[in-house]
Regions:
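Cap/lid and interdomain-hinge subdomains that line or gate substrate/regulatory clefts
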Residues: 2, 6-9, 107-232, 236-239
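C-terminal catalytic subdomain
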Residues: 296-416
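Extended hydrophobic packing segments that form well-structured cores
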Residues: 370-473
Length: 473
């Protein structure tokens, strides 16, 4: 990533304080369990430790810590039964989900030889889960439950914890980076239009506006020939260029990529949405002709770059890039009715990390269809297998909504005129998919990632408090 971000996850554990003087052996038992539990939290996030809470005062102290850190998620370990006042003061001032983790130490009771202390310390983590959820509901807090076991290991529970932490990374990325809008959306594509103040209010994402005149001059001061040469080689390593590629052939493009990378770092950019509708010539025309591969190099490094000024699909691309490692701009492209296949793809910048079937290609075209000018197009080749699509839209009141679907990319003929396109089969069939997806009212762009990611997207949506339409999976 050109701009790195790290989610902050508040972690604490609760137990009923009245048990501890009655059964002193529970103190070291719970301390050991909590220390072990914290090791289950992935190193990819920053752990904000609220400690073991057995009183309201300790809960308040944990809450102060979480609030000061601006945590993206709270994970609560239930050690044994505890009353909900051990929990609520820690989360009452937060607007993030609380994940209740009920991990029982022993896989099964030794019924004949279990005393009260052993039951409370090793077999009673499930005792208060329902109570916690009931009070989180009444407090208007979002929540989730993970149930599992420590003895013998529990990959399913560990995977759920890791998935929640992965989803939390999205919130941190939206809060800690900015979105650059260069120019304005494609004229008349009203589904793309957006209120940037509402965007900041609801999704924590701040928009910085840039004029094309500034972008045209962005590489004027780039003189480090070693950096340009290294970036030119990176471009050649990323793309097969029609007619052959050389360092000299992509030198100017590499110069712009070096400049754009520094711009992304200076402005803390996680997202770029751009569109140009002029008749650029000279230096401006040169940049316009090579902008698609230049932005593709940024996408590869974690900055979502969307064509046609589509901020919403830039967000979708970033979400998928953050949780899956890839985020490819797409749209409904065509339908192969005899094969019952949807052709999904788009022209413009894309993500080399999705191109597992073949090395991405770059070619020059005389005209960008529907736009002014011509230049380089890039095409990416997702491998056959599961694929996830994510669209983002808004209702009449400005609330955001996610639209998601899972399908399977199948091998077969694709278009070869320079645009990325995939042959996707959906369980509901191509006709019904097109109807259902369209009826959900997404923008006409979507993001794509190889793999099945709906479960993680549902967690992201809960973190942002955004509804989700699941079309098919």
């Amino acid at each position: 990533m050109l701009v790195n971000t790290k989610a902050r996850v508040g972690v604490f554990a609760i137990a009923l304080g009245a048990y501890l003087p009655q059964f002193p052996s529970l103190v070291p038992e719970f301390e050991a369990q909590y220390a072990d539990f914290k090791k289950r939290i992935p190193d990819s996030v920053e752990l904000i430790d609220g400690g073991i809470v057995t009183t309201k005062e300790l809960a308040c102290a944990a809450g102060d810590k979480f609030r000061a850190a601006d945590v993206d998620l709270v994970i609560l370990q239930l050690l044994t039964y505890a009353t909900s006042y051990n929990m609520l003061p820690a989360v009452c001032d937060l607007d993030v989900p609380v994940v209740l983790v009920n991990l029982q130490k022993k896989a099964a009771p030794d019924y004949a030889n279990t005393d009260t202390a052993t039951w409370l310390g090793e077999l009673y983590a499930c005792g208060a889960v329902g109570e916690m959820v009931a009070d989180l509901e009444r407090a208007g807090k979002r929540h989730a439950v993970i149930t599992g076991v420590v003895e013998g290991g529990d990959p399913e529970a560990d995977a759920e914890i890791a998935d929640w932490c992965r989803a939390a990374q999205v919130r941190r990325r939206f809060r800690d980076t900015n979105l650059a809008q260069i120019g304005r959306p494609y004229p008349g594509m009203m589904d793309l239009y957006i209120d940037e103040t509402n965007l900041y209010h609801r999704m924590f994402l701040y928009t910085k506006q840039f004029d094309w005149e500034k972008m045209w001059a962005i590489a004027d001061d780039v003189t480090d020939e070693d950096a340009i040469r290294a970036k030119a080689q990176d471009i050649l390593d990323t793309f097969d260029i029609e007619g052959g590629g050389t360092i000299e052939k992509v030198w100017d493009m590499a110069k712009y990529v070096v400049a754009f990378e520094q711009w992304v770092k200076d402005e803390q950019l996680g997202f770029v949405a751009s569109h140009y509708d002029g008749f650029a010539q000279g230096v401006a025309g040169k940049l316009d002709s090579m902008l698609i591969p230049a932005f593709s190099m940024l996408i590869k490094q974690g900055t979502a770059c969307a064509v046609e000024g589509d901020i919403k699909v830039a967000m979708a691309m970033s979400i998928l890039k953050t949780i899956s490692g890839m985020g490819q701009l797409s749209e409904m492209y065509s339908i192969d009715f005899p094969e019952d296949i949807c052709i999904i793809g788009h022209s413009g910048s894309g993500d080399a990390d999705i191109s597992k079937a073949k090395k991405p290609t770059m070619k020059i075209v005389p005209v960008f269809h529907g736009k002014t000018g011509g230049g380089y197009l890039t095409q990416f080749y997702p491998a056959p297998g599961p694929v996830t699509y994510l669209g983002i839209t808004q209702d009449r009141d400005g609330h955001f909504k996610f639209v998601v679907a899972e399908g399977v990319n199948e091998p077969g003929p694709i278009f070869t005129f320079g645009d990325t396109n995939m042959r996707t089969r959906f369980t509901c069939g191509a006709r019904d998919f097109c109807n259902r997806w369209s009826e959900a009212g997404p923008t006409h762009h979507m993001a794509a990632a190889s793999g099945r990611w709906i479960d993680t997207i549902l967690k992201v949506a809960k973190i942002f408090n955004v509804p989700v339409d699941v079309i098919t999976r």
